[in-house]
Amino acid sequence: MSRKNRAPKRDVLPDPLYNSQLVTRLINRVMLDGKRGTAASIVYGAFEQIKEATGNDALEVFETAMENIMPVLEVRARRVGGSNYQVPVEVRPERRTTLGLRWLVTIARLRGEHTMQDRLAKEILDAANNTGAAVKKREDTHRMAEANRAFAHFRW
């Protein structure tokens, strides 16, 4: 175990265009090799595509998509008496957001569209409509937690 104190959480500044911390966190998640400008243009371009496709505010569509992706339950391994049990636990709010963003970007990168901007826009639209691989990932996580409900009394 580390002897040092836990590092304090840093505040994320809201992005200049949408004034949202969630969008800033998405940009940080998309960013590779410290290229924030490139990541920002990808995210803002995807938001423009979403606005054109739906006619609604892109931020609202994104927030709906995030609500559909973020897990409520997950399983954690717990060793009891020589065997490992998958124990279902509730996901803390901060971790919910982190997992949602991570799944969204990871799955968008795996999509087949030509540019990352297209992939991200399509995945956000799919998630907002409760379809797509990111929502499936959440459902699988919930299904796993439900299947292991019998071990919920091992919660710590």
Swiss-Prot record:
Tagged with keyword Transmembrane: no
MF (Gene Ontology): mRNA binding; rRNA binding; structural constituent of ribosome; tRNA binding
Keyword terms: Ribonucleoprotein, Ribosomal protein, RNA-binding, rRNA-binding, tRNA-binding
Q: Where is the signal peptide?
A: none
Q: Which InterPro entries match?
A: Ribosomal_uS7, Ribosomal_uS7_bac/org-type, Ribosomal_uS7_CS, Ribosomal_uS7_dom, Ribosomal_uS7_dom_sf
Q: List the Gene3D superfamilies.
A: Ribosomal protein S7 domain
> Where is it found, in Gene Ontology cellular component terms?
cytosolic small ribosomal subunit; ribosome
PROSITE patterns associated with the record: RIBOSOMAL_S7
| Recorded coiled-coil stretches | none
Q: What is any Pfam family matched here? A: Ribosomal_S7
Q: Which GO terms describe its biological process?
A: ribosomal small subunit assembly; translation
Q: How does it assemble?
A: Part of the 30S ribosomal subunit. Contacts proteins S9 and S11.
Chain's role: One of the primary rRNA binding proteins, it binds directly to 16S rRNA where it nucleates assembly of the head domain of the 30S subunit. Is located at the subunit interface close to the decoding center, probably blocks exit of the E-site tRNA.
- Family designation: Belongs to the universal ribosomal protein uS7 family.
Spell out the protein name for this chain. Small ribosomal subunit protein uS7
UniProt lineage: Bacteria, Bacillati, Bacillota, Bacilli, Lactobacillales
